[in-house]
């Protein structure tokens, strides 16, 4: 197993280019299952564990893929298997994205329940509800979602999500583009990742109105075509890199971005005392001498993203005073806090709010990654901690950050990747 060994105390400064978005890559790769007409060429696809897992799932279904230099080519011409097995789905909840495309194209899909799903209210219910609104029959047995279409073809319908869900909106879109008639989606997620998926489907030949809003209208079509497409930048990686500079007192320019998509995050950096300048495709951040404590509330886009909440908590450990961080998307997304406190942070949890008391001099020690964004917060803390920090179980980090230690080292960090035996 890999760990990152971080020698703290270096300023993160320089110029870097953002990677392609993981959260956009996964649904557009899933959308390649909608047609066997040609080969897709997808550019700016990041080299990540989740991308590898997803392409393995496509291979299992019968698709052919090649990946070289951040370009992924996919042909779904020979897809035959309609079952997504637990062995692959358990590695990544986003595997549920294959449900909509397979059901719409083939009339049947059998997808293992993602690991950790319990009966009762759970996020996957929204995906299943959307398929049922389009005429699918859903049964769950022996750990599998079995989806069929009694009428042979999905029918346009009206889908209203009780809460905003990026994943369920994406699945509904991919199913609706091949449905017969018109589908409307109310309270759709409006995140840039969904807007990009809409643009991808439109380029394939779909008709979608309301792109970028919470009300979508889709006219079903009979055939779609393979296309060449460039993925968008990863706004969470970009935000994490900005936070790395801010927490260490550095100055950074991140290229290859769309600042408009990061307005909520950039606004908070300004409130924290940073100087932020933007162009059409770059963000420059200059750190203040003292960080100002800044409260954030994570909510669906265009608000501050839940995927930046953990990194913001790490940053606020160095601010002069107390900050309140509230997560209204995932109320209990605070697994990183005990580990940050092990490094010397002073953070309290009250229900869905973290109270960060700063500034605290952090001291390096061993800490354990628990999930993707929690891992990023520990790396940020390690950059500013005194001494050496070892971040264990970085396979979580590798799921969503492309060569993060190489990028940070190019900006002045001292991070090495080492093997370790977790049981010794």
Swiss-Prot record:
PTM-bearing positions, type 2-(S-cysteinyl)pyruvic acid O-phosphothioketal: 117
Compartments in which it is found: Cytoplasm
Record-linked CDD domains: UdpNAET
Keywords from the UniProt entry: Cell cycle, Cell division, Cell shape, Cell wall biogenesis/degradation, Cytoplasm, Peptidoglycan synthesis, Pyruvate, Transferase
Gene3D superfamilies (alphabetical): Enolpyruvate transferase domain
Major enzyme class: transferase
Pathway info: Cell wall biogenesis; peptidoglycan biosynthesis
GO terms for biological process, alphabetical: cell division; cell wall organization; peptidoglycan biosynthetic process; regulation of cell shape; UDP-N-acetylgalactosamine biosynthetic process
Binding sites annotated in the UniProt record for UDP-N-acetyl-alpha-D-glucosamine: 93, 122-126, 307, 329
Catalysis performed (reactions): phosphoenolpyruvate + UDP-N-acetyl-alpha-D-glucosamine = UDP-N-acetyl-3-O-(1-carboxyvinyl)-alpha-D-glucosamine + phosphate
Cellular component per GO, a single term: cytoplasm
EC nos: 2.5.1.7
Keyword Ion transport: no
UniProt family annotation: Belongs to the EPSP synthase family. MurA subfamily.
NCBIfam families reported in the protein's UniProt record: murA (TIGR01072), PRK09369.1 (NF006873)
Protein name per Swiss-Prot or TrEMBL: UDP-N-acetylglucosamine 1-carboxyvinyltransferase
Source organism: Pelodictyon phaeoclathratiforme (strain DSM 5477 / BU-1)
């Amino acid at each position: 197993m890999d760990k990152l060994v971080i020698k703290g105390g270096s300023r993160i400064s320089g110029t870097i280019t953002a990677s392609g978005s993981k959260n956009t890559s996964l649904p557009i790769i899933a959308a390649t299952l909608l047609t066997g007409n040609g080969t897709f060429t997808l550019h700016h696809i990041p080299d990540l564990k989740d991308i590898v897992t997803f392409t393995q799932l496509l291979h299992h279904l019968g698709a052919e893929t090649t990946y070289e230099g951040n370009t992924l080519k996919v042909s779904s011409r020979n897809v035959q298997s309609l079952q997504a097995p637990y062995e692959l789905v358990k590695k990544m909840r986003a595997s549920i994205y294959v449900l909509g495309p397979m059901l719409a194209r083939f009339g049947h899909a059998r997808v293992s329940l993602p690991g950790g799903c319990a009966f009762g209210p759970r996020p996957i219910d929204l995906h299943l509800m959307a398929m049922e609104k389009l005429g699918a029959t859903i049964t769950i047995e022996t750990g599998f979602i079995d989806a069929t279409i009694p009428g042979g073809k999905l029918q346009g319908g009206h889908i209203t999500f009780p809460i905003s869900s990026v994943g369920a909106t994406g699945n509904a879109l991919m199913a609706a583009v091949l449905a017969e008639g018109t589908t409307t989606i109310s309270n759709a997620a409006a995140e840039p990742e969904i807007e990009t998926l809409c643009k991808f489907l439109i380029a394939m030949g779909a008709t979608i109105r309301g792109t970028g809003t919470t009300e979508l209208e889709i006219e079903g079509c009979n055939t779609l075509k393979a296309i060449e497409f460039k993925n968008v930048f990863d706004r969470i990686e970009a935000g994490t890199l900005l936070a790395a500079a801010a927490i260490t007192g550095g100055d950074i320019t991140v290229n290859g971005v769309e600042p408009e998509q990061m307005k909520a995050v950039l606004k908070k950096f300004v409130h924290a005392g940073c100087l932020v300048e933007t162009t059409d495709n770059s963000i420059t951040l200059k750190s203040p001498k003292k960080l100002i404590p800044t409260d954030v509330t994570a909510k669906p886009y265009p608000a501050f993203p839940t995927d930046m909440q953990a990194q913001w908590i790490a940053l606020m450990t160095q601010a002069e005073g107390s900050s309140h961080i509230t997560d209204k998307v995932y109320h209990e997304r605070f697994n990183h806090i005990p580990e940050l406190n092990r490094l010397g942070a002073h953070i309290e949890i009250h229900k869905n709010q973290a109270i960060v008391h700063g500034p605290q001099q952090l001291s390096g020690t061993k800490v354990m990654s628990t999930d993707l964004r929690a891992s990023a917060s520990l790396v940020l803390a390690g950059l500013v901690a005194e001494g050496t920090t070892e971040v264990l179980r970085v396979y979580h980090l590798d799921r969503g950050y492309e060569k993060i230690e190489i990028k940070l080292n190019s900006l002045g960090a001292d991070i090495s990747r080492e093997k370790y035996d977790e049981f010794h």
